[in-house]
A protein has these predicted regions:
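C-terminal beta-strand-rich structural cap/linker in extracellular carbohydrate-active enzymes
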Residues: 778-793
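Surface beta-strand/loop "capping" patches
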Residues: 721-754
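Catalytic cores of carbohydrate-active enzymes
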Residues: 149-151, 166, 380-382, 502-618, ...
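Short strand-turn-strand beta-turns centered on an Asx-Gly dipeptide
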Residues: 768-772
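Aromatic-rich carbohydrate-recognition surfaces in CAZymes
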Residues: 342-347, 351-476, 497-504, 632-655, ...
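Carbohydrate-binding/catalytic loop surfaces
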Residues: 332-340, 382-418, 450-456, 477-496, ...
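Extended, well-ordered alpha-helical scaffold segments
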Residues: 272-278, 288, 312, 358-371, ...
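Anionic coordination/interaction segments
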Residues: 1-346, 359-372, 398-405, 432-436, ...
Length: 793
């Protein structure tokens, strides 16, 4: 069953059946002001931080679902009939409504009672202003008298206080109206103001929620809309909203357009922004937004026989990856802002995967991570970048609602709080950034440590690798410490196969960089460490058919052929190959086991069989319901590791089988099973040991997106940037006859056409660039455009 379709020409997903099983969300904004909204305009807006500067209110996990939002009501003043452009909250017959999710914008459309209407939400490019662009057309054959009402509910800035501490929040906010501008005032803050205004003189307003909604009513049937006239309410204290009314008369066929602006600042800011954001300026900003994404997406475009892959790689996969790099993990309908900051491992992997489209942001994220590294060599698992920025001038008074000033003696946790994998991801992120940009000088940039002192980027990397080399258990395998990548499987602090494999991968990438920098002594020293890690890992972790997951603190191996639960684990087997530890024979056997035990039509399960008996020596994973999340679900993030592993082994058909199973775009016609957005990778898909098998949950905010993009472009399509050129080494299904990739790299553009005359899955017979045979694609002068022909065989 389908609820919509991909409009790739306009880079939009069109929801033409709006009663989707769960909210289908999207993001607006690119910088400090951003928000998340669903297909019916439910959602919230914030400024800089989802915890301390919420602008509009949201009630998560509620009934009716996912509201309030940023709504526009239309009322026929002659009949009293009213509806909302976004279908909800009024909920007229669904056949009259649709939604288009675009890249950082959303369009809601209604065609009801002879009135064609559109509400477009996006954020201005240069100012913290959300623009509601509303267009109306009278498609009936008679004159129509209409009223337009907006509705948003302002939030107390601090999200926990807004949801729990009403004795404070209800008496610390006020509202007023002047000259067509509603001002929301958070009195506890010096600059705690928001405005809501329009590009016309309103016929009425309300800024008290309860006056607008009325007693014993909801957003579905607000009293003011039902009555057709605003009450002009405002007050100090209470719950506040943004309601502006416009009375219109439309002749048959007549169109009109209205702008509404929600932004940071008080009445004066509202006046200024209203003057600035005319309809022409709104059009200009929207055109700039489209151009912004044009530039991003043009960095890499593909044409393959797989339309689902084309849709993902050319539009939605990169878009989702960019959202994660920009906004991290704590702004969604699942993570609603009660905790904020950067997760170390997630941020490092995000930055690793898309430096080609967002080098400045990836570089910035890498520096933030370097500053959150201790001299011991471990990273702070969850941190706020501002903790390590230059001291700001303290505010003139202490407020319980603003972002607190950190106690720097308390923010650096000890080894007990360290996750063994966190900082290892950063090593490869740095190397990938340098391979992409050619910025070798970055390795010598001096950056501070979280616990004092400073060192170069290169020195930070050495501390990370040395830390992992020291933190080994009695079997010589890296300790898992608080946890490795799988937070729920920490083996009681035992030894982690995944961390040892990840250590080897990081070492290999570091050695390549050291050689480029001329640090040959370091290259030799760390090569010896890598060889030792490989030797110990092979001797301890190989179990005859696959690699074990780890060893508990009590020295019990987990993930062996003798186990009845948790026998085969995806992380250890994929990383044995991806890291370069496994030889070809062991790699084939390990990945055959992954296919045999973990494959489902919806992706690869994290482990099998599921754990059913609690065992705290293994970890909390044994207390997770079978088939959910870390216990036997199709956990999306590590799935691309399997695509990489199969590509390394030369099995393109197997890699594509795994890719297709997880690909959201290829599940567009089974929404009765998937339920969630078909344009977004989700955190997990419910596994086969659960009654909801195949159901996807937690969209957008997941590292699976960046890894899916990285694995598909660099390992499956095989376009890999290196220090001195681009390697082209595809691994594809044998029945692919050809594919093309357009890749921008260091200011040049490479049009790569790959043919497969011998129907192989891996192997390159020849590479020709502008008629000349080459081994890899060289760095070219900025502005160069070249044609590349690659023949597999």
């Amino acid at each position: 069953m389908r609820y919509g379709y991909f409009d790739n020409e306009h880079r939009e997903y069109v929801i033409d059946r709006v009663d989707v099983p769960v909210s289908w969300t999207n993001y607006i904004g690119l910088k400090d002001m951003y928000g998340v909204f669903n297909h019916t305009a439910g959602g919230y807006l914030l400024y800089k931080t989802p915890e301390y500067h919420r602008i509009t209110r949201f009630r998560p996990n509620g009934v009716p679902m996912d509201g309030p939002g940023h709504y526009v009501y239309l009322r026929d003043q002659d009949t009293g009939d009213y509806w909302s452009i976004s279908w909800q909250p009024v909920g007229k017959p669904k056949e009259h409504f649709s939604c288009r999710h675009g890249l950082s914008y959303i369009k809601y459309h209604s065609d009801y009672a002879g009135i064609d209407a559109e509400q477009k939400l996006f954020v201005a490019m240069d100012d913290p202003v959300e623009i509601w662009d509303v267009k109306l057309r009278n498609d009936s054959d008679k004159v129509r008298h209409l009223s337009v009402f907006t509705y948003l509910e302002f939030s107390f800035h601090q999200v926990d206080m807004d949801n729990k501490n009403f004795q404070m929040s209800l008496y610390a906010t006020g509202s007023r109206y002047e000259d067509g501008v509603i001002e929301n005032d958070l009195y506890y803050e010096e600059d705690g103001y928001q405005f809501f205004t329009s590009d016309f003189t309103p016929n009425g307003f309300d800024s008290l929620r309860d006056s607008f909604i009325g007693g014993y009513r909801t957003e579905r049937n607000p009293l003011v809309v039902e009555a057709g006239v605003c009450g002009g309410s405002f007050e100090k204290g209470g719950n506040h909203c943004g309601v502006l009314q416009k009375v219109l008369t439309l002749q048959p066929g007549e169109e009109t357009r209205l702008l509404f602006l929600l932004g940071e600042g008080g009445i004066e800011a509202g006046r200024k922004m209203r003057q600035k954001y005319t309809q022409a300026r709104a059009d200009e900003d929207f055109a700039r937004l489209l151009k912004f994404w044009d530039n991003k997406l043009s960095c890499l475009q593909v044409s393959t026989p797989n339309e689902g892959m084309n849709t993902e790689l050319n539009i939605w996969n990169l878009y989702q990856s960019e959202i994660n790099v920009m906004f991290s993990r704590f702004t969604s309908f699942i993570e609603v802002g009660g905790r904020t900051g950067l997760g170390y491992r997630d941020t490092a992997q995000d930055a690793m995967t898309i430096p080609h489209s967002n080098p400045d942001k990836c570089r910035g994220r890498i520096i933030e991570l370097l500053r959150a590294l201790t001299k011991e060599g471990y990273g702070l698992h969850l941190f706020e970048p501002r903790w390590f920025e230059p001291e700001e001038k303290p505010q003139s008074f202490k407020s319980p609602t603003v972002v607190p000033t950190p106690d720097k003696s308390q923010i650096v946790h000890g080894l007990k709080g360290a996750c063994a994998d966190d900082a290892l991801w950063l090593v490869t992120a740095i190397v990938q950034y340098i391979r992409e940009t050619g910025d070798m000088a970055f390795a010598h940039q001096v950056v501070t440590y979280a616990d004092g002192g400073e060192g170069t980027v290169y020195e930070h990397m050495k501390r990370i690798l040395d830390f992992s080399a020291r933190q080994v258990g009695i079997n010589g395998i890296c300790k898992g410490l608080r946890a490795d990548w799988n937070d729920c499987l920490n083996l009681g602090g035992g030894e982690s196969a995944m961390v040892s494999f990840l250590h080897h991968w990081a070492l290999r990438n570091f050695i390549a960089l050291a050689e480029q920098l001329g640090e040959m002594k370091d290259a030799a020293e760390y090569t010896k460490i890598a060889e030792h890690v490989k030797e110990v890992s092979e001797s301890v972790l190989w179990d005859g058919k696959w690699y074990i997951r780890g060893i508990t603190a009590g020295n019990r191996k987990i993930g062996t052929q003798a186990d009845t639960e948790g026998r085969v684990h995806m992380e250890s087997n994929t990383w044995a190959v991806l890291s370069g530890v496994a030889d070809h024979e062991h790699g084939i056997s390990a990945m055959d086991s992954v296919d045999e035990y973990l494959y489902t039509p919806y992706g690869l399960m994290l482990n099998a069989p599921c754990f059913t008996t609690p065992d705290d020596s293994i970890g909390f994973v044994t207390r997770v319901y079978p088939g959910l999340k870390e216990n036997g679900a199709v956990f999306s993030h590590p799935n691309p590791w399997a695509w990489c592993a199969e590509a390394i082994l030369g099995r393109g058909s197997r890699a594509m089988k795994f890719y297709n199973a997880l690909c959201p775009a290829l599940q567009n016609d089974i929404i009765e099973v998937r339920q969630s957005e078909p344009y977004s990778y989700c955190q997990f898909v419910v596994g086969k040991d659960h009654t909801a098998y195949g159901r996807a949950r937690h969209p957008f905010m997941t590292g699976s997106s960046g890894w899916a993009y990285f694995a598909a472009t660099q390992y499956m399509l095989g376009i890999r940037p290196d220090f001195d050129g681009i390697t082209v080494d595809p691994c594809i299904p044998a029945d692919w006859k050809e594919f093309s990739v357009s890749r921008k790299w260091r200011g040049a553009e490479y049009h790569i056409h790959v043919t497969n005359p011998d129907a192989v899955e891996k192997g390159v017979k020849s590479i020709t660039m502008n008629g000349r045979q080459v081994r890899k694609l060289p760095v070219l002068p900025v502005g160069t455009v070249c044609d590349v022909e690659v023949v597999m065989g």
